[in-house]
């Protein structure tokens, strides 16, 4: 009898799996299923994802009975906390969305048991169309819980109009920014040239320190509790390289997003996610309301020495909250549609991401970009993809709380440090203070 | 009674008649039920129910929208008054005029610094997605398009939570914003561009009106640099001397409207629209829409042509989606044309509901009919079963031990048993009588047989006697023939004439003799006495002129022969 029951249960389980993503459809065009969605594409701006969703709803969605409704457009820095609040039923938070942008570490915090395993919805042949590293990045405990939709890296964004003037006056060229040494030298020159303006705002400063260490040592060891090994002399050395520039006000940790500091004329450039291109205005407006075209120039990350170079592989993927078979099937239809070759290419070009689809990646070579800023962005991406090793972001528990505390502390410190530097204090001493602060972050 | 006469059809079985009566009863009950449902409004059409649901929803939505925008209008006026007071105090403190603010980055920065907290608190308190104050001045008149550039502060809420952390600086000095912990919006700009914000000129023109009548609701527009669309509730900021300082107001973005006005209703995929436009078309692109809380709705797009659908409803046909619902005019500002609020549901949903209702009714009535027919069949069969069984049992031989569940049948059995008993008693009597009659019949038969034997014997004797008579006649004839010549014709004539003289009795006796009867036979046959016979014999012989009876018989035989022509003509001739 037990054997019979177990066979029956297994058969039912298989049947449910088949009906969820493979077998007879659970979708009904006359009674559409709604997928609520939170994403991070185009917060506070024109959202290419929202336009794609509208297109999906009007075409495939209408045909198959799926309606994707965006209930929250947020940012990668906020979505994790918002999802966790939704999952725990925070009264001020909307219900847990059916689809959401997420990192693998967020997926882990949410609990992979709550998330749909996309492997059950895509065949092996279908998955072969995606970049294997991106699929691997979204896989946890054998389950593909974060489906790659787009991947980003970091790049250096510059106000081209102002850089031309700066270059004409100082002789600093874009080529000079290909190494950190050239970069910091240019930053120092700009600070002087601009009467004390930072050259560049960094969104994720610590990652560049990491890559610098890795370029020297080939690897970076983390401690058991998921933080940096502060006894590592290479780490301190690399940190001090950035800290000196920071202490002198040549670079800053961005207030929130480096692009806002570029478009307000506060800095000449910013280093942040390639996806930030969506948020750059066409013009830079200065406090006297004068403005000029941004003429956005995007460069690869400066290189650290002559060894192997590293670049971050960031960018959220899509996860689905495991609820009903019908929603699972609908989510798979939507994600499959969203990541199809040409559509994926259009989407990533518009949002500044790297495609996840092999076909789209190949097609990007001959793509006609809408403006020079996007063209230079994808040139930079291509350069890095060809010459840099992608590194996934750390996914330790509590890591990002410490990083946030680090950045917040640096923001608090940097103004005063710059004043002290301007007043003649040693950059090394000030940088040591920054190192000490880094060491104090727990 | 015409209906019931049909049930008197003699060829219909009792079951069929009862079934007919029950079906008739069921039909009457169903009709009564239908009439009741109709009277109590349960038979209202789907359109009617849809209208009532949407009408209630319209009341709610209209009230929500009206209250919301009335509140925003009032708050816009309050903000305008506050800004007037604030600005004039600042100008007085600085001993400058409003026009001195132009190109004065310091004053503008100070003004923004002083007002930004007030705006932040206002934004946190009000039901809106943004708040702004646009001063009719600019920080730099020399830049290109400065005629459209206006300084001010525009704060926006970002995200679904109305919290301090989610406030962004959409327009204004970034440094001032950062100083107060308000980060620039991703699409931040320093100043407003009046050519990108609607109705600046319209509201400027309203500044001459009393403040309470000067607010204005803009058309829906795209917030510059974003894909978000919004309307603004705007009021002019007017100085105490009547000079125009700028405008202020509140933003209601399309996404905020969708969230804030989501209707807690069970109407699936309800779509509510606030837009401008007339009765013939609704411009969905110019409106704000919302749906059902916790559900989705199809965002209306483009122009929706309005066509009457009857029952107070209208069809709203768009390029992609069609709806059914109703509209009302609503006045949100004295300076705007009346807006239109529409409460709609998907036409496809409605059509499905109509079809579903029809099918439900059809199935319901089919079930009722099936149930009624089944019940009639079952109950008529069940009811008649004991009766028919009783009738079958009545046909059976033995009814003595029968018990039925129908008392009337039992009474009938008692009655029939009594009848049977009486019948058997009668039958016994008849049987007995029959036996008696049979016995009598047998006796009579026996008697008859005996009589028959007697008769046969007599018949045989008669035949024999007849033969003897025949022999005797033959003998007589032979004798007469032989003795014809011995008879005296006169005597014979006398004999013949003497016959005519015989009395009746004598003639009768004479005839008996002629028949061959003996005296004894004649006495027995006539009942006369022997002496009387002798007396008659004497008289007969005397009158016939014969001496003896033998002679008389001879003459008589001769006479018969002559009458029959049996004797030769010569005798007759002689006799004549």
Ranges and model annotations:
Chain A
Residues 48, 237-241, 326-338, 402:
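Short amphipathic alpha-helical coupling segments at ligand-binding clamshell hinges
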Residues 62-133, 165-169, 268-269, 287-290:
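Extracytoplasmic "Venus flytrap"/periplasmic binding protein-like
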Residues 362-365, 369-442:
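Conserved C-terminal helix/tail region of periplasmic/extracytoplasmic solute-binding proteins
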């Amino acid at each position: 009898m037990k054997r019979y029951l177990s066979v029956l249960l297994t058969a039912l389980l298989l049947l449910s799996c088949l009906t969820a993503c493979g077998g007879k459809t659970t979708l009904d065009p006359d009674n559409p299923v709604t997928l609520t969605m939170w994403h991070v594409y185009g917060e506070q701006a024109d959202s290419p994802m929202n336009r794609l969703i509208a297109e999906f709803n009007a075409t495939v969605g209408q045909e198959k009975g799926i309606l994707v409704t965006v209930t929250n457009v947020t940012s990668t820095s906020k979505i994790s906390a918002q999802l966790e609040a939704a999952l725990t039923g925070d009264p001020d938070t909307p219900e847990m969305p059916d689809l959401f942008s997420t990192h693998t570490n967020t997926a882990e915090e949410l609990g992979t048991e709550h998330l749909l395993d996309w492997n059950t919805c895509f065949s092996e042949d279908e998955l072969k169309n995606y970049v294997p590293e991106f699929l691997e990045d979204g896989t946890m405990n054998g389950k593909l819980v974060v489906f790659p939709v787009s991947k980003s890296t970091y790049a250096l964004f510059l106000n081209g109009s102002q850089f031309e003037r700066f270059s004409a006056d100082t002789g600093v060229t874009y080529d000079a920014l290909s190494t950190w040494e050239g970069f910091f030298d240019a930053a120092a020159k700009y600070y002087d040239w601009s009467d004390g303006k930072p050259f560049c705002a960094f969104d994720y400063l610590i990652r560049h320190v990491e890559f610098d260490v890795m370029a020297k040592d080939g690897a970076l060891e983390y401690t058991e509790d998921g933080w940096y090994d502060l006894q590592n002399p290479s780490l301190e050395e690399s940190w001090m390289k950035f800290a000196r520039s920071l202490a002198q006000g040549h670079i800053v940790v961005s207030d929130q997003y480096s692009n806002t500091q570029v478009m307000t004329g506060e800095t000449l450039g910013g280093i942040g996610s390639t996806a930030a291109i969506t948020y750059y205005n066409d013009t830079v407006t200065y406090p006297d309301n004068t403005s000029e075209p941004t003429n956005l120039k995007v460069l690869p990350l400066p290189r650290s020495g002559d060894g192997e170079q590293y670049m971050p592989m960031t960018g959220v993927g899509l996860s689905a909250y495991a609820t009903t078979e019908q929603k699972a099937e609908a989510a798979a239809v939507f994600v499959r549609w969203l990541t199809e070759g040409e559509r994926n290419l259009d989407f990533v070009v518009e949002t500044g991401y790297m495609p996840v689809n092999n076909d789209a990646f190949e097609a990007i070579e001959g793509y006609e970009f809408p403006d020079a800023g996007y063209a230079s962005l994808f040139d930079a991406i291509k350069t890095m993809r060809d010459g840099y090793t992608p590194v996934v972001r750390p996914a330790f528990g509590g890591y990002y709380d410490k990083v946030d505390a680090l950045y917040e502390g640096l923001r608090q410190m940097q103004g005063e440090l710059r004043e002290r530097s301007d007043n003649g204090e040693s950059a090394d001493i000030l940088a040591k203070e920054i190192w000490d602060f880094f060491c104090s972050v727990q | 009674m015409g209906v019931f006469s049909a049930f008197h059809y003699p060829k219909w079985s009792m079951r069929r008649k009862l079934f007919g009566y029950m079906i008739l009863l069921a039909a009457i009950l169903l009709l009564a039920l239908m009439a009741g449902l109709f009277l109590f409004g349960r038979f209202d059409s789907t359109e009617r129910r849809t209208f009532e649901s949407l009408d209630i929803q319209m009341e709610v939505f209209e009230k929500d929208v009206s209250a919301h925008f009335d509140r925003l209008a009032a708050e816009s006026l309050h903000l305008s008054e506050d800004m007037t007071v604030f600005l004039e105090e600042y100008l007085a403190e600085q001993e400058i005029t409003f026009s001195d603010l132009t190109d004065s980055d310091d004053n503008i920065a100070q003004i923004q610094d002083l007002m930004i907290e007030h705006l932040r608190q206002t934004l946190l308190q009000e039901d809106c997605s943004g708040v702004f104050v646009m001063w009719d001045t600019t920080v730099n008149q020399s830049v290109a398009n400065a005629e459209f550039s206006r300084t001010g502060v525009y704060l926006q809420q970002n995200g679904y939570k109305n919290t301090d952390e989610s406030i962004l600086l959409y327009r204004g000095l970034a440094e001032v914003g950062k100083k107060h912990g308000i980060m620039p919006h991703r699409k931040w700009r320093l100043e407003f561009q009046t050519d990108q914000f609607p109705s600046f000129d319209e509201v400027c023109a309203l500044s001459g009106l009393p403040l309470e009548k000067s607010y204005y609701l803009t058309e829906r527009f795209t917030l510059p640099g974003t894909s978000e669309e919004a309307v603004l509730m705007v009021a002019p900021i007017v100085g105490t001397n009547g000079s125009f300082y700028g405008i202020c107001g509140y933003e209601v973005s399309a996404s905020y409207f969708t969230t804030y006005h989501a209707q807690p209703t069970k109407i699936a995929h309800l779509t509510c629209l606030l837009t401008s436009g007339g009765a013939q078309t609704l411009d969905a692109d110019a409106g704000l829409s919302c749906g059902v809380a916790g559900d989705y709705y199809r965002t209306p797009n483009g122009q929706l042509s309005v066509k009457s659908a009857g029952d107070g409803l209208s069809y709203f046909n768009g390029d992609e989606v069609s709806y059914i619902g109703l509209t009302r005019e609503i006045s949100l500002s004295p300076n705007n044309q009346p807006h239109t609020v529409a409460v709609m549901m998907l036409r496809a949903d409605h059509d499905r509901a109509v079809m579903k209702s029809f099918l439900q009714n059809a199935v319901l009535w089919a079930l009722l009919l099936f149930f009624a027919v089944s019940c009639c069949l079952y109950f008529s069969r069940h009811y008649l079963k004991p009766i028919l069984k009783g009738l079958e049992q009545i046909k059976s031989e033995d009814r003595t031990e029968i018990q039925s569940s129908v008392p009337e049948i039992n009474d009938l059995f008692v009655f029939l048993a009594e009848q049977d008993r009486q019948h058997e008693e009668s039958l016994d009597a008849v049987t007995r009588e029959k036996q008696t009659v049979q016995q009598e019949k047998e006796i009579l038969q026996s008697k008859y047989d005996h009589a028959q034997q007697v008769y046969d014997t007599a018949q045989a004797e008669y035949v024999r006697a007849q033969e003897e008579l025949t022999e005797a006649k033959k003998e007589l004839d032979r004798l007469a023939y032989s003795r014809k010549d011995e008879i005296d014709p006169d005597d014979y004539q006398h004999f013949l004439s003497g016959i005519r003289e015989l009395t009746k009795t004598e003639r009768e006796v004479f005839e008996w003799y002629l028949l061959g009867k003996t005296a004894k036979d004649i006495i027995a046959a006539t009942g006369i006495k022997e002496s009387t016979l002798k007396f008659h014999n004497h008289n007969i012989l005397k009158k016939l002129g014969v001496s003896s009876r033998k002679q008389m018989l001879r003459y008589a035989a001769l006479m018969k022969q002559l009458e029959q022509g049996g004797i030769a003509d010569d005798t007759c001739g002689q006799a004549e």
